C-alpha cells in the first residue's frame, strides 16, 4: 500500500547536524521532519503532541458518553467496542522513518505504542539495526522494516569469528572484512594499486555482506530490506 504522509524522525544529539545534512541531500518530497529530545522523560510528551494523543483520548471519552445511558442492543455493543480502545481518531501520518539506534530507538517505539499509534495503519521503518535481537523483547512493535546487510552471511561471519576468537565481533569488523576482499580484487585485477582511482570499477562487486558499486568517486553498498516478524528477521 502506497504511503503518502511520511514523517522522518531523529533525535537532538551530537549527530543532529550530520543527520540533517544527509536528510537534506536526499531531496525527499512530501516528508515532514520531527526532531525529538534524547531525554526519555521529555520524549513521551513530544510524541503525545506529534500523535495528537490528548485530543484522540478526549474523542474517545466523548464518544463513550453518547452510549453510556442507552440500553438498546446496538448502543450496548458500540459501548463495548469503545471500551476496548485507548483513543479515537487517526494520526496525521501513515509512515515513520526513525533515524536512531539502541535504547533511544526503543524509547521512541515505546512512546509511539503508548500514544496508541496503529501498527496496522502506520508503517514503521528505521535505519540499519545490525539485527539487534533486543528489539524483539523490549518493545511491542510487531513489524519494523529496515535496510541491512545480508543476514545469512552476517550470521556466518559472526559464528566464524566467535569460533576463532571466543568473542563476537562488532559491526565495523565485517566492513573491514569486505574491504580487504575489495583490496585483493583491485590488486588482482590491476596488478598493483597506486591510488583510489584503481577502485573505480564499472562492474558491481559482490562481497560477503552485500554488493558494492562505484560511481562518481563514491562506493555504494546495496542493502536488503528486512522486517521483524514473530521474533525473526525476515527478508522482505
Positions of PLM-derived features:
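Sec/Tat-exported extracytoplasmic proteins
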Residues: 1-3, 23-27, 54, 100, ...
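Extracellular/periplasmic Venus flytrap/periplasmic-binding protein
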Residues: 1-103
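Generic signature of mature, soluble extracytoplasmic domains
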Residues: 3, 103-106, 112-121, 131-132, ...
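Stable alpha-helical elements in mature extracytoplasmic
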Residues: 15-22, 39, 43-46, 104-107, ...
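Extracellular/periplasmic periplasmic-binding protein-like sensory domains
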Residues: 28-29, 48-76, 91-95, 103, ...
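Structural signal for conserved beta-strand scaffold positions within catalytic alpha/beta enzyme cores
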Residues: 35, 126, 145-148, 227, ...
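Short, solvent-exposed coil/turn elements at secondary-structure transition points
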Residues: 36-40, 130, 150, 231
